[in-house]
Amino acid sequence: AARPYVTRLSSSGYIDEMANGQLCVVMGYSGDINIARQRAIDGKTGQKIEAQIPSTGGLLFFDVMVIPADAPHADNAHKFINYILRPEVHASLTNKVFYANPNAAALKFVKKDVAENTTIFLSDADKKLMHAPDSLPQPIKRVQTRVFTSFKAGR
């Protein structure tokens, strides 16, 4: 069983801990792992960090921006979204958080090393391995939560 060898389950703080060499293995978001990699390089910590795509594939998530139908300042929301969609701005976000964006006009502003990172901009072969998370029925979600809670508790 793997659980006795797991020292902590956390979704916060692991970026800096990874960059500083305090963790040996992490299951996390590719953007977070690439941020840790860059921090290790910038901080000259000596840590070699690589995001990896499992050979069996993985989940593909998307961030979206929405405006509620009853938003009191919808015009401002549209202005903000239009600002984010400016190629230079969209590219600066990709360069900072290491997530691809769908804005083709932004690609020319993405740093070369970021644009060539295949855990950020997936190859066609890797794209075929990825899938959206399944929408699970409520009873399955309850079982999933119970099992994960038990695992975290060390049982």
Positions of predicted regions on the chain:
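Conserved C-terminal helix/tail region of periplasmic/extracytoplasmic solute-binding proteins
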Residues: 124-155
